Amino acid sequence: MLHLHILSWVLAIILFIATYLNISKNQGGSPFFKPLHMILRLFMLLTLISGFWILIQSFMNGGANHMLLTLKMLCGVAVVGLMEVSIAKRKRHEQSHKMFWITMALIIITMVLGVILPLGPISKLFGIG
């Protein structure tokens, strides 16, 4: 399940950037916008489902830092929401660059939290998790 989660969020980030850049300020969405947006939503849903599954497994197994897991879950849900809001703002021709960069910063924070959690690579490297 961890591999599905990592694959889905990597593809979601790539699709988010592609979808965001496929909206022109003058002409609106390109012909590729709607399929990209639908595929992005699919991968965001896969990310959320696999993330909740990993969260439930970590809570049941014990030994995990529940506060960091909950914080990462909240950041992940916020990232998905901010992705949708920034794409919607750009589609309505509103100022969306600030929202885009806030979303990217929150993506990085969420990734850092995932790296330091018990299933992350740093925890495995030092034998913590």
Curated annotation (Swiss-Prot):
Keywords of this entry: Cell membrane, Membrane, Transmembrane, Transmembrane helix
Domain of life assignment: Bacteria
Please name one Pfam family that this protein belongs to: DUF1516
Membrane topology recorded in Swiss-Prot or TrEMBL: Multi-pass membrane protein
Main location class: membrane
Q: Which residues form a coiled coil?
A: none
Bilayer-crossing residues are: 1-21, 36-56, 67-87, 99-119
Q: GO cellular component terms?
A: plasma membrane
Which InterPro entries does this entry report, sorted A to Z?
A: UPF0344 (IPR010899)
Location of this chain's protein in the cell: Cell membrane
Q: Which NCBIfam families match?
A: PRK13673.1-2, PRK13673.1-6
Family to which this protein belongs: Belongs to the UPF0344 family.
The protein, known as: UPF0344 protein SaurJH9_0969
* Lineage of origin: Bacteria, Bacillati, Bacillota, Bacilli, Bacillales
